[in-house]
UniProtKB/Swiss-Prot annotation:
It comes from Neosartorya fischeri (strain ATCC 1020 / DSM 3700 / CBS 544.65 / FGSC A1164 / JCM 1740 / NRRL 181 / WB 181) (Aspergillus fischerianus). The keyword Secreted applies. Keywords: Carbohydrate metabolism, Cell wall biogenesis/degradation, Disulfide bond, Glycoprotein, Lyase, Polysaccharide degradation, Secreted, Signal. Glycans are attached at residues 46, 351. Its EC number is 4.2.2.23. InterPro entries: Carb-bd-like_fold, Gal_mutarotase_sf_dom, Galactose-bd-like_sf, GH-type_carb-bd, RG-lyase_II, RG-lyase_III, Rhamnogalacturonase_B, RhgB_N. It catalyses: Endotype eliminative cleavage of L-alpha-rhamnopyranosyl-(1->4)-alpha-D-galactopyranosyluronic acid bonds of rhamnogalacturonan I domains in ramified hairy regions of pectin leaving L-rhamnopyranose at the reducing end and 4-deoxy-4,5-unsaturated D-galactopyranosyluronic acid at the non-reducing end. This is Probable rhamnogalacturonate lyase A. It comes from the Eukaryota. GO terms for cellular component: extracellular region. Pectinolytic enzymes consist of four classes of enzymes: pectin lyase, polygalacturonase, pectin methylesterase and rhamnogalacturonase. Degrades the rhamnogalacturonan I (RG-I) backbone of pectin.
Length: 528
C-alpha cells in the first residue's frame, strides 16, 4: 500500500495522466498534440511554418525557446493541417516541393516523421533538427563530448572548435549509416533519441556518415541528416525519406525495432507498404573472411544494405521494385558488382562472388578493407581534428617493411605537413623484375593524389580524382570514391638489397597545414 506521503507526492503526476486525452487542440496559431502516453508527451506545431515550438514531456519543457525544431533551418511558411483518425494523429506540412509529416500513435511517447521532396531544398541539404533544452538534456550519445562545442573557439571554418584543449565538432558525432540505428541526447531525468530504420531515399551508401548531435551552448541539437554535401558520393534522391522517429523516455534507452507499418494507412505521400516490396537473398563468397562482409543495392531511387551471416548468406531489407546495382564489400572495399531485379511480393535469389586480386606480394602495408585501419592516427581521426594534441606526430614518417609497426605509417598525408611518406624494404634477386605498386586511397581533398618514386624511377602524376568539394579528414570523414592507383615499375628498378619508395601528395591546388591537398590511405601493396 502506498503511504499518504507517497500519494500526496504522486498526485500532480497522476492527475496529469488522468487528465491526458489523446487528441489535437487547435488555437489560432498552433496545433497542440497530446500523445496520451504514460509519461505525458505534448508538443506544439506552429500552423504557419511547421516549427515545433514546445515539447512538454513528463512536466518538463524540452524544446529550446529561442528557435523551433524543424526541417532544414525552417520552412519559412507552409500549409499546415492536423487530422485525427482513431488512434493516430497526423500533422501535414506542405510547400511546393516538400511535404513533412508528424505522426503520433495513441499512448506512445514518440513523434514519428517522414519527409517527401520533389526538389532539393535551397540550402543544399535535407535534415530535421530538434533544438532541445541543453539544461535538461546536456549529454550526447553515444560518443559524448566529442561534439560538444559549447564555449569553444573556432579553429576551422565555423564548425571545428577548440574546447578546454580538445578539438571538437558536430561532425565528430557521426556514425556509418549501416550502424547508426539510434542516437540520443540526454540528462539525468530525460532522454530523446532519433530512431532510424529507413535510409532508402538518403544518399551515400552504407558507409556514409553525417552529423548526429551537437551541444553548441544555446541548445543541444539532435539531427537526422537525410542528405547533404558532406563528403557526398551520390546524387540526392527524391521521394519519401523515412519514417524516422523521435522517441522520448525518462531514463532508459529505447530499442530500435519500431514498427511503423501503420504509415500504410495514413495517406503518406510516396510511402511503399511491405506488400508492394520485394527482397533479394543469396550467398556471398570469395572475400577475406577476417572482415565483415556487406551487400549493398542501389539505383537512382533507393538504396539498401545488409551484413552477411558468417557463412556469407544474406537477405535484403524489403525493397522497392526495380533494377539495382548490387555490390559486395570486404569491409568497405568493393570486391564484386552485378545487377539484380526486384519484384513486388517475391524474393529474388542472387549470389555474388569476388575477392581482392593482386599478384605475388613483395610487401603489403595495411589491408584492403576500404578504411585506414591501424595506420597512425586512424583510431582518433573520427573524433578529433588532425591538429589535436592527442594525435601522434604526423611526420613525415619512414616505414621499414619487416620492422616498423603499422602505426608508423600515416593514415593520411598532407601536401604542406607530412608529404612524402618513405617506405624502405629489402628485395631478393628474384624480386628485381617488373612490378606494380598499388596505392589504395579512401578519400582525397583539393585534388590530392599520390605520386610514387621507387629508387631512381619516378612514377607518373595520376589524373586528378573527382572533387567532392567538401572537407573530409578534418571533419572526421575518411570515405570518398576510394581511388586505387597502380604504378608500373620497370624491370631492374628494384634492386637486390635495400630499396626506397617515397609517396608524395601532388595537386595543382595549395593550402595550409591540414587544409592542404591530401589523401587517406587504404592499403599499399607491391607485387609482381
Amino acid at each position: 500500500m502506498l503511504s499518504k506521503a507517497t500519494l500526496l507526492l504522486s498526485l500532480p503526476f497522476w492527475a496529469r495522466v488522468a487528465n491526458a486525452a489523446f487528441g489535437i487542440t487547435t488555437t489560432s496559431s498552433s496545433y497542440v498534440i497530446d500523445a496520451n502516453s504514460a509519461s505525458p508527451l505534448k508538443f506544439t506545431v506552429n500552423r504557419s511554418n511547421c516549427d515545433i515550438t514546445s515539447i512538454n514531456f513528463y512536466g518538463a519543457e524540452l524544446q529550446y525557446q529561442g528557435t523551433g525544431s524543424h526541417i532544414g533551418s525552417g520552412l519559412g511558411s507552409a500549409s499546415v493541417s492536423a487530422t485525427q483518425s482513431g488512434d493516430y494523429i497526423k500533422v501535414t506540412c506542405s510547400t511546393s516541393t516538400l511535404t513533412h509529416y508528424f505522426v503520433v500513435h495513441n499512448g506512445d511517447p514518440i513523434i514519428h516523421m517522414a519527409t517527401h521532396i520533389t526538389a532539393e531544398p535551397s540550402i543544399g541539404e535535407l535534415r530535421f533538427i530538434a533544438r532541445l533544452n541543453n539544461e535538461l538534456l546536456p549529454n550526447e550519445e553515444p560518443f559524448g563530448q566529442v561534439s560538444n562545442t559549447a564555449g569553444g573557439t573556432a579553429i576551422e571554418g565555423s564548425d571545428v572548435y577548440l574546447v578546454n584543449g580538445q578539438t571538437r565538432s558536430k561532425f565528430y558525432s557521426s556514425e556509418r549509416f549501416i550502424d547508426d540505428h539510434r542516437h540520443c541526447v540526454s540528462g539525468s531525468a530525460h532522454r530523446v533519441c532519433m530512431i532510424l530504420n529507413q535510409y532508402e531515399s538518403s544518399s551515400g551508401g552504407p558507409f556514409h556518415r553525417d552529423i548526429n548531435t551537437n551541444n553548441g551552448g544555446q541548445y543541444n541539437a539532435l539531427y537526422w541528416y537525410m542528405n547533404s554535401g558532406h563528403a557526398q558520393t551520390e546524387a540526392n534522391r527524391m521521394g519519401l525519406h523515412g519514417p524516422y522517429s523521435m522517441y522520448f523516455s525518462r531514463s532508459g534507452t529505447p530499442g530500435t525495432n519500431i514498427d511503423t507499418s501503420f504509415f500504410a494507412n495514413l495517406d503518406i505521400k510516396g510511402y511503399v507498404p511491405a506488400n508492394a516490396r520485394g527482397k533479394v537473398s543469396g550467398k556471398a563468397s570469395g572475400a577475406d573472411s577476417t572482415f565483415k562482409w556487406v551487400v549493398h543495392w542501389y539505383n537512382d531511387e533507393a538504396q539498401y544494405w545488409t551484413y552477411t551471416a558468417s557463412d556469407g548468406s544474406f537477405t535484403s531489407p524489403a525493397m522497392k521494385p526495380g533494377t539495382y546495382t548490387m555490390v559486395y564489400y570486404q569491409g568497405e572495399y568493393k570486391v564484386a558488382s552485378t545487377s539484380v531485379s526486384v519484384s513486388a511480393g517475391s524474393t529474388t535469389t542472387k549470389n555474388i562472388s569476388g575477392s581482392v586480386t593482386t599478384g605475388k606480394t613483395i610487401f603489403k602495408i595495411g589491408e584492403w578493407d576500404g578504411q585506414p585501419t591501424g595506420f597512425r592516427n586512424a583510431a582518433n581521426q573520427l573524433r578529433m581534428h588532425p591538429s589535436d594534441s592527442r594525435m601522434a606526430s604526423w611526420g613525415p614518417l619512414t616505414y621499414t617493411v619487416g620492422s616498423s609497426s603499422l602505426s608508423d605509417f600515416p593514415m593520411a598525408i598532407f601536401k604542406s605537413t607530412n608529404s612524402p611518406v618513405t617506405i624502405k624494404f629489402t628485395a631478393s634477386s628474384s624480386q628485381t623484375g617488373a612490378a606494380t605498386l598499388r596505392i589504395g586511397t579512401t578519400l582525397s581533398f583539393a585534388g590530392g593524389r599520390p605520386q610514387a618514386k621507387v629508387n631512381s624511377f619516378t612514377g607518373p602524376v595520376p589524373s586528378a580524382p573527382k572533387d567532392l568539394n567538401s572537407r573530409g579528414v578534418t571533419r572526421g570523414a575518411y570515405r570518398g570514391f576510394g581511388e586505387v592507383y597502380d604504378v608500373a615499375i620497370p624491370a631492374g628498378t628494384i634492386v637486390a638489397g635495400t630499396n626506397t619508395i617515397t609517396i608524395s601528395v601532388v595537386s595543382g591546388s595549395s593550402g595550409d597545414t591540414f587544409l592542404s591537398p591530401n589523401f587517406i590511405f587504404d592499403c599499399v601493396e607491391l607485387f609482381q
